[in-house]
């Protein structure tokens, strides 16, 4: 049986996302576990167009965009020390973390 832990990180700021991935990778490497990544996933760009004026001047518009950056880390065959190390990692406030445990047969 082969177990894997998949960690997906999401953030609007790529610098804080890269810092969080470095902290997680260094914590996992201290436990001598096999880690793949960080794998950069495609970023999502949301664009919004709004009128500048609330009443007239339809041709005068303003555009905004928001970028969501994502990374994937895969830890192969984790042991209890890896789970303990991951629970002690302190990450930045703007980073969203999703952890999945996948068991293969």
Curated annotation (Swiss-Prot):
One of its GO terms (molecular function) is structural constituent of ribosome. GO terms for biological process: translation. InterPro entries: Ribosomal_uS10, Ribosomal_uS10_dom, Ribosomal_uS10_dom_sf. SMART domains: Ribosomal_S10. GO terms for cellular component: ribonucleoprotein complex; ribosome. Keywords: Ribonucleoprotein, Ribosomal protein. It comes from the Bacteria. Pfam families: Ribosomal_S10. Involved in the binding of tRNA to the ribosomes. Belongs to the universal ribosomal protein uS10 family. Part of the 30S ribosomal subunit. This is Small ribosomal subunit protein uS10. It comes from Rickettsia rickettsii (strain Sheila Smith).
């Amino acid at each position: 049986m082969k177990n894997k832990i998949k960690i997906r990180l999401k953030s609007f700021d790529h610098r804080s996302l890269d810092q969080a991935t470095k902290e997680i990778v260094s914590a996992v490497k201290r436990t001598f576990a096999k880690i793949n990544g960080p794998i950069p996933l495609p970023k999502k760009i949301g664009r919004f167009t709004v009128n500048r004026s609330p009443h007239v001047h339809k041709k005068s518009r303003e555009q905004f965009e928001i970028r969501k950056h994502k990374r994937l880390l895969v830890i192969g065959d984790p042991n209890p020390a890896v789970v303990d190390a991951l629970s002690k990692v302190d990450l930045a406030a703007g980073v969203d973390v999703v952890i999945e445990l996948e068991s293969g047969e």
